[in-house]
Amino acid sequence: MYDPPFLEALMITASFFAIFIIIVVSVLLLEGGGD
């Protein structure tokens, strides 16, 4: 019986973290002057 909820939590955390990083990078680029 191998049915870890850890894997599901890890995937959710990973996708949320990826979205967060994309938003942060976008904000940094916009504030940096994008040119």
From Swiss-Prot:
Keyword annotations of the record: Membrane, Transmembrane, Transmembrane helix
Q: Where in the cell is it found?
A: Membrane
A single cellular component GO annotation: membrane
Provide the membrane topology annotation.
Answer: Single-pass membrane protein
Q: What is its main location?
A: membrane
* Transmembrane parts of this sequence: 10-30
Its protein name is Uncharacterized protein YoaI
Q: Which gene encodes it?
A: yoaI
